Amino acid sequence: MTLPEHSPLGKPSAYKTEYDASLLFPIPRQPKRAEIGLPEGRALPFFGVDIWNAYEVSWLNLKGKPQVALATFIIPADTPNIVESKSFKLYLNSFNQTKIASPEALQQLLHHDLSEATGGTVQVRLVTEADLGTQKMGELDGLLLDRLDIETDIYEPDPTLLSAEQEESPVEETLVSHLLKSNCLVTGQPDWGSVQIRYVGAPIDQEGLLKYLISFRNHNEFHEQCVERIFTDVMRMCKPVKLAVYARYTRRGGLDINPFRTNYNTPWPDNRRNARQ
């Protein structure tokens, strides 16, 4: 099994500038899922995707002229592995002095390598220079929890902060906070994010939910793992009929990671970059 502590994170790394797929470092999802009550073999209570955006993609055309693009990678949540982010960056940098016939050829290569590493089918989208002007920005929709004047001193995840008024009539709400902060599982470096929670069910106590999201502040876990922990805690403590959790994290090393988990059929998020990204 590949373990996070064996990854390139927190270690000096040589930056290869010619293509090397072996730089990708997969990490199994299952051990961290077991920690949140999802043992191996049990059906997952959610489905979804991890949306990765890469802003520093460059290669050479066959004449040696540099090319640049933005790339989006859509990784299904049911793949057995995630890819450690520093290894992803090193892998992308390995294209910098590599000659590739066309953007389409690069896209096919990225699709193959990422699918191999994650154990599933990864969608790859490239935005080349000609289409950079089509990119849009926008904030997460929803009622802002950060407006609440709460007091807290809890900075490790505490599901008991969550509650819902089960005697009340069901509601449909979309709640948003920009106060999500967690830390890298290996290095302890801060990860900053915005999170959107959409649900149908008994009204969730908003102050408790905000305190709960803030409680991740000293917690060490990868982005995908934090979102799955939020999803399972809200399901267990608040018992909504429908739930979708979407987080957009600020970029590091030219990459941002945006996990989405839901228990009902709904379109995937539209991947609009927000102002903090």
From Swiss-Prot:
Record field: catalytic activity: 7-aminomethyl-7-carbaguanine + 2 NADP(+) = 7-cyano-7-deazaguanine + 2 NADPH + 3 H(+)
Active site: 184, 191
Signal peptide start-end: none
UniProt main location, coarse: cytoplasm
Top EC group: oxidoreductase
Functional pathway: tRNA modification; tRNA-queuosine biosynthesis
A GO molecular-function annotation: preQ1 synthase activity
Family statement: Belongs to the GTP cyclohydrolase I family. QueF type 2 subfamily.
Protein name per Swiss-Prot or TrEMBL: NADPH-dependent 7-cyano-7-deazaguanine reductase
Protein's organism: Cupriavidus metallidurans (strain ATCC 43123 / DSM 2839 / NBRC 102507 / CH34) (Ralstonia metallidurans)
Biological classification of the source: Bacteria, Pseudomonadati, Pseudomonadota, Betaproteobacteria, Burkholderiales
Name of the gene: queF
